[in-house]
C-alpha cells in the first residue's frame, strides 16, 4: 500500500510471494550461495556503501575476493534462481538505502543455519543497512516471548543479558550476586542433549513448554533417550512427551500470569493476569523457587516483579527498566539496552556502528556447502516442511483451539 518493494526468497511459494516485486524460489539449503551471489553483483557494479565499509567493517578485501566465485551464472546453477532475478534483487536491495531483512526459522533450522544468518549480515554491512531506521537484519521469532526467554539466559552459553558463562569476570559477578559456585562450561544445545543422554552425560531432563518427542529430529532416537533419562515436565497441556515424564508440574497460561514479554524489537512490555488459576496449576517461577529451596538453595520471592528487580542488578541492558517506567510510557514498553532509569531506551541498535569492540562489524567468508539431505539426478525431488499459518509447531496449543482446528484440521502434501 505504501509503495515499498518486497523481495521474497523461499523454496515454497508462500502467500507473501504473491504480492512480492521479486520472488526468488531458491532450492532448499542454498541461502548462503544466494547472499554471496548478490554480493558478487553489488561489488561488481559498485553498489556497496564504501564509506560505511571503511568506518565500520573489517575483512572487506577477503570477502570481496571470495565472492568472485559466485557469479550470477554460478549462483543460478546452485540456487535454481534465474541469474536475471539474482541481479535485479541485488540492485534493488543495495540501491534502496533503507533496506530491511527479515528472516525466520526457515533459514536457521539447518546444519548451516548460523552461516545463513551471517551471510545476511554481510549483505547489510556491505550496503550500510545497519543502525538506521528501516534497515537491519531482523529475526522474526517463533512466538511472542522467545526474545524475552533468550534475554533471560535461556541459552546454553549465556547468563541474562547475553553475558557469557565462560567469561571469568561475568562468572565472578553472578557468583557474588547469587552466592553460589557456578559452572564455567557451556551447556548442551537441544540437538546435543539427546546424544548426551545416551552417552550417560545427562541424567535428568527438565522440559518447560517443549514437546521434543515430536519436534526433535529422529523420533526413535529421541524416544530412546527420553525413556532412559529422568524426565520432569512443566507445561500447560499434556503432549506426546508426557508419556515419558516421571514428574509433571502443571503450569499457567499467558492470561493467568503477571510479568513481562519482550518482542523481536527488544521491547519489554507488561503482561497482566486476567484469569484465575485453576486446580494445581502454578506459575513457573513459583515452582522453580520451591525446587531451589528443596535442593538446598534458599530463596524467596513474593512476586514476579521481585525477580525482575533482581535481574536488573546483574544485567546492564535491563538496569534502567522498571515496571513503573513501562507503565509510565503509555504501556508501550521500553526497548533495551536501557542502562539507567533516566535513559529512554534504544529504538535502533548500532547507530554509531556495530556493537562490537571498536565499533566494527566482522565480515565473514562463508562457503556454500551442499546439504547432506540433497537429492540426486535419479530422484531430483526434495521434501521440505513449511509453516501452516493456523498452527504452531507440534499443535500442543493450537490443536486445542476449536476455530483454528476447524480451519486447518489435517496435514497435506503439496507438489510443484
Region annotations inferred by a language model:
Residues 1, 156-157, 398:
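Conserved thiamine diphosphate
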Residues 1-145, 152, 165-345, 383, ...:
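Cofactor-pocket helix-loop regions in the catalytic cores of large enzyme subunits
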Residues 161:
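Glycine-rich active-site loops that engage anionic ligands at enzyme catalytic sites
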Residues 329-415:
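Long, compositionally biased stretches
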Amino acid at each position: 500500500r505504501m509503495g515499498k518493494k518486497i523481495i521474497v526468497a523461499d523454496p515454497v511459494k508462500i502467500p507473501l510471494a504473491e504480492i512480492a516485486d521479486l520472488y526468488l524460489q531458491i532450492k532448499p539449503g542454498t541461502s548462503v550461495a544466494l547472499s554471496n551471489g548478490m554480493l558478487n553483483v553489488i561489488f561488481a557494479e559498485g553498489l556497496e556503501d564504501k564509506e560505511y565499509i571503511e568506518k565500520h567493517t573489517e575483512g572487506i578485501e577477503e570477502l570481496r575476493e571470495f565472492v568472485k566465485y559466485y557469479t550470477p551464472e554460478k549462483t543460478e546453477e546452485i540456487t535454481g534462481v534465474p541469474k536475471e532475478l539474482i541481479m535485479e534483487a541485488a540492485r534493488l536491495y543495495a540501491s534502496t538505502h533503507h533496506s530491511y531483512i527479515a528472516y525466520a526459522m526457515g533459514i536457521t533450522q539447518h546444519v548451516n543455519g548460523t552461516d545463513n544468518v551471517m551471510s545476511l549480515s554481510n549483505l547489510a554491512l556491505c550496503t550500510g543497512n545497519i543502525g538506521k531506521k528501516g534497515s537491519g537484519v531482523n529475526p522474526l521469532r517463533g512466538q511472542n516471548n522467545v526474545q524475552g526467554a533468550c534475554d533471560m539466559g535461556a541459552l546454553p552459553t549465556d547468563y541474562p543479558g547475553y553475558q557469557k558463562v565462560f567469561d571469568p569476570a561475568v562468572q565472578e559477578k553472578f557468583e557474588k550476586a547469587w552466592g553460589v559456585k557456578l559452572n564455567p562450561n557451556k551447556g548442551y544445545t537441544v540437538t546435543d542433549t539427546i546424544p548426551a543422554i545416551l552417552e550417560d552425560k545427562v541424567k535428568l531432563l527438565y522440559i518447560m513448554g517443549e514437546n521434543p518427542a515430536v519436534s526433535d529430529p529422529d523420533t526413535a532416537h529421541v524416544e530412546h533417550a527420553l525413556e532412559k533419562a529422568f524426565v520432569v515436565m512443566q507445561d500447560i497441556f499434556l503432549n506426546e512427551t508426557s508419556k515419558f515424564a516421571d514428574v509433571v508440574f502443571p503450569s499457567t497460561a499467558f492470561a493467568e500470569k503477571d510479568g513481562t514479554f519482550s518482542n523481536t524489537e527488544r521491547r519489554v512490555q507488561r503482561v497482566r493476569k486476567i484469569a484465575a488459576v485453576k486446580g494445581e496449576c502454578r506459575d513457573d517461577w513459583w515452582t522453580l523457587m520451591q525446587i531451589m529451596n528443596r535442593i538446598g538453595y534458599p530463596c524467596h520471592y513474593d512476586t514476579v516483579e521481585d525477580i525482575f528487580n533482581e535481574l536488573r542488578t546483574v544485567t546492564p541492558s535491563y538496569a534502567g527498566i522498571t515496571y513503573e517506567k513501562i507503565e509510565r510510557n503509555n504501556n508501550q514498553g521500553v526497548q533495551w539496552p536501557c542502562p539507567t532509569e533516566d535513559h529512554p531506551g534504544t529504538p535502533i541498535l548500532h547507530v554509531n556502528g556495530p556493537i562490537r569492540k571498536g565499533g566494527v562489524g566482522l565480515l565473514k567468508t562463508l562457503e556454500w556447502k551442499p546439504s547432506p539431505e540433497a537429492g540426486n539426478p535419479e530422484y531430483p525431488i526434495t521434501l521440505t516442511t513449511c509453516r501452516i499459518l493456523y498452527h504452531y509447531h507440534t499443535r500442543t496449543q493450537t490443536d486445542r483451539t476449536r476455530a483454528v482446528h476447524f480451519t486447518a484440521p489435517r496435514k497435506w502434501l503439496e507438489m510443484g
